Each structure stands twice: as structure tokens, then as C-alpha cells.
């Protein structure tokens, strides 16, 4: 009996996984159903699902307790560990194994949070997103504020002057759709020069209010998305390309289309029929979406397009465009101030009022926008690192491999390969 067991083990150990006999397929199916089960306890958890409808119906009907879900996920992780120890895998299968392991570990982390377990901001971001954003002292932001202070005209506090300066660049509500449509069309045109997308891909845009976010891509499967834009607060002219590229081309819409096309439809990997928001996938999704606007619209080219097309459409004088972007370039360096507000607040080191004031002082938010951001932090917690830290990781990954602004073909190739791959944050360093 021992001899037979040993022979079977050696046969298993020498196996190289093929597409039709991949033991991870059953784990992937169970993973999808457990993500759907968590979604019954957390309305924000399942960002997209386009797998078998009966799995969704089953999750609703059963409403598994969180303890049962956690136990089932632990079992899947044990099975994955066994596969890793006994099965010889090629590079693609190794990446799939790592991806499933990290995604399942993030499910456990989210379940622990839902069960009331406390983690620090950095512990949570590592457990959910596979990354920890750098920490900056208040002095870092004070230095940046001093650099910005001399650039912004007017009198009074910098935050007040910054708000007043930007008022001249607000898109009038009655021109918003025309400006966004133009930005989306140009982002699509540029993306399709380098990315092969299915002919039926498309998305629709809706304008909404009362949300904690500025825009959201709801991927529906079948190569289609719904993009919602929050018009509750003023939208500035620079946000047209930001949102068109981030939510659409080559951002979230393209990312999801490529995953569905290359990994679900081609490879039949069912784990890509669901997208759990609080997972390592999100750092790549948000980071690539933020960096995507730079890939599609390099700085000088973006300014030219905006001055010639978007500014006139919005009825904004393009004469002030250079100054506007000079100010925004410096202000963008304050991005990590939002992380510090979230980290301090969620770790109990800042009161809500102090965190909100921090956003006003160091992110230069209006009181209304700071309040909206606080609601985002309370809803999505350490998710905030995925935008700036994620973008920095993606930028460094692409550019360190030759994908620089002076080599757009190479930049697009590396960027698109990343969108279609299984790489997570720890694999970008």
C-alpha cells in the first residue's frame, strides 16, 4: 500500500499541468462562489460578476455564515498549497497559482474584517491589496505646500486661492456631456491604435449624484461597461481626460475586457468571471487606470488636445491652460496626503474632524470635497492606496522596462501585457 501511494505521489509530482487537467479549475470555481457568498454580507464586495447566473442565485439563497465561508476558503488555500508542493507547473500556471492564493487570502482578510477583527491601515492594505504605501511626515507636505504657494495667484489662504483659481476651469453642467463624449472618443481612438479589442466592446455613461466617489466603472461582462459620473460637485476640465482614460480607455473598461477575453474566454479560467473589489486585483486595476491616462495622453500632447478641442467645447479660455497645468503638476505631488489622512483616521490617531482638516490643508480640498473624501475613506478604507501607490508601481514597472514617453510603442506593449497578465503588486517590484 505504501509503495502504491509513493508511486502515485511521484507521478503527481512529475505532472506538468495542462489546460484540460488543471486541478486549479475546481478551486477557481469554488473561489468564485465564495466571493459571491461574501457579497451577501458586504454590498461593496462584488464589483463585477458575469459567470453562471445560478451561482449568484445559490449565494443569495444560501447566505452562508461568515464563519463557514472562512473555513471553506482555508480549505481551498490548503488545497492550493498541496498543489504547489506536488505538481510541477510552468510559468503561466505558477502565476495563476500565486494569483489564486493571494486572492483567496484577501477573501479571508475581508471576512475577518466583517467579523469585527481589527487591523492597522498598513496591515489591512497588505492583506487585501498585496501592498503597503510609503508613509510621509507632515513636514513633507508642508514643503510641497510652500512650493505651490508662490504659483497660485490671489490673496488669502492657499486652499481658498487654489479653489478660486480653479473656478475658471469648471466645465459648465450643460456642456459636460459634450466634453466627456469628446474626451472618450479621443481616448478610444488612441487606445485602439495599440490595443486589439473585440468589435462589440462598448460602454454607456450615466450622470449621478450622492456618491462618495467621482466616477465608477461597473463592468457588466460581454465586453460592456456602465460608467457613472458623479456631478454633485463641480467637475474641472482636466477631469474629462482623467475620467475618460481611467474609467474607459485604456483604464478599467479595457482592463476588464482584456481579462474577460484572454483569461476567461480563451483560458476558461473561471476566477475571472468575478471581481472582488477588496482584493489584490484592485491595486493593479486602479494603478494601471491612473497610469493609463499618461500612456494615452502624454503631457504635451494632452495639453494640445485640450486647448484645441476640450477647452473650446467647455467654453473655457485656453489662454490659461499652461498656467493651470503648471499648478496642477505641483499639486499632484500632494497625492499621498490623502493616504496619511486615511491612515491616521483609521488607525485612531486623527479624529474625523482633524482628518477632514488635513485634506483641506494638504490635499487642498474644499470643505465639501473633503467631506466627500471622508465618506469615501469610511466606505473603502485602505483602498485609497491603490490609486497613487498603484500608479507609482505600474509606472516604475513599465518605464524600467523601456516603456518611456519617447518610445510609445514599447510603452503600450508593456502596459497592455500588464493588463492581460496575472501580476500583482508584489510582482511589480
Label every PLM stretch briefly:
Residues 1-8:
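Sec-dependent signal peptide recognition
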Residues 9-18:
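Hydrophobic h-region of N-terminal signal peptides that target proteins for export
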Residues 19-429:
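N-terminal maturation segment of proteins
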Amino acid at each position: 500500500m505504501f509503495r502504491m501511494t509513493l508511486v502515485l505521489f511521484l507521478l503527481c509530482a512529475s505532472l506538468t499541468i495542462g489546460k484540460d487537467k488543471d486541478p486549479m479549475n475546481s478551486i477557481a470555481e469554488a473561489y468564485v462562489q465564495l466571493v459571491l457568498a461574501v457579497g451577501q454580507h458586504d454590498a461593496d464586495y462584488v464589483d463585477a460578476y458575469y459567470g453562471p447566473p445560478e451561482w449568484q442565485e445559490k449565494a443569495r439563497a444560501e447566505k452562508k455564515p461568515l464563519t463557514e465561508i472562512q473555513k471553506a476558503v482555508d480549505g481551498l488555500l490548503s488545497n492550493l498549497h498541496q498543489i504547489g508542493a506536488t505538481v510541477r507547473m510552468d510559468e503561466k500556471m505558477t502565476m495563476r497559482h500565486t494569483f489564486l492564493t493571494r486572492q483567496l487570502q484577501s477573501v479571508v482578510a475581508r471576512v475577518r474584517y466583517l467579523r469585527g477583527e481589527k487591523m492597522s491601515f498598513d496591515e489591512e492594505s497588505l492583506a487585501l491589496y498585496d501592498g503597503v504605501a510609503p508613509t510621509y511626515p507632515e513636514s513633507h507636505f508642508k514643503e510641497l505646500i510652500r512650493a505651490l504657494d508662490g504659483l497660485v495667484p490671489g490673496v488669502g489662504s492657499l486652499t481658498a486661492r487654489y479653489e478660486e483659481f480653479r473656478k475658471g476651469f469648471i466645465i459648465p453642467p450643460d456642456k459636460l456631456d459634450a466634453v466627456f463624449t469628446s474626451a472618450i472618443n479621443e481616448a478610444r481612438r488612441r487606445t485602439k491604435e495599440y490595443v486589439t479589442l473585440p468589435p462589440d466592446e462598448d460602454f454607456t455613461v450615466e450622470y449621478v449624484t450622492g456618491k462618495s466617489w467621482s466616477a465608477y466603472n461597473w463592468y457588466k461582462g460581454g465586453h460592456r461597461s456602465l460608467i457613472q459620473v458623479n456631478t454633485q460637485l463641480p467637475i474641472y476640465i482636466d477631469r474629462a481626460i482623467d475620467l475618460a482614460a481611467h474609467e474607459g480607455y485604456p483604464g478599467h473598461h479595457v482592463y476588464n475586457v482584456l481579462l474577460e477575453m484572454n483569461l476567461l474566454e480563451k483560458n476558461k479560467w473561471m476566477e475571472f468571471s468575478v471581481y472582488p473589489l477588496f482584493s489584490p486585483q484592485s491595486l493593479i486595476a486602479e494603478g494601471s487606470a491612473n497610469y493609463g491616462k499618461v500612456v494615452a495622453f502624454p503631457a504635451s500632447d494632452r495639453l494640445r488636445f485640450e486647448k484645441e478641442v476640450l477647452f473650446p467645447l467647455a467654453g473655457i479660455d485656453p489662454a490659461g491652460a499652461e498656467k493651470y497645468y503648471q499648478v496642477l503638476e505641483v499639486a499632484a505631488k500632494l497625492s499621498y496626503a490623502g493616504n496619511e489622512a486615511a491612515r491616521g483616521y483609521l488607525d485612531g490617531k486623527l479624529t474625523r474632524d482633524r482628518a477632514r482638516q488635513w485634506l483641506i490643508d494638504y490635499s487642498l480640498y474644499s470643505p465639501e470635497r473633503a467631506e466627500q473624501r471622508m465618506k469615501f475613506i469610511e466606505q473603502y478604507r485602505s483602498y485609497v492606496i491603490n490609486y497613487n501607490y498603484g500608479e507609482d508601481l505600474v509606472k516604475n514597472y513599465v518605464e524600467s522596462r523601456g516603456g518611456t514617453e519617447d518610445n510609445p510603442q514599447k510603452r503600450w506593449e508593456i502596459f497592455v501585457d500588464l493588463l492581460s497578465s496575472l501580476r500583482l503588486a508584489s510582482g511589480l517590484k
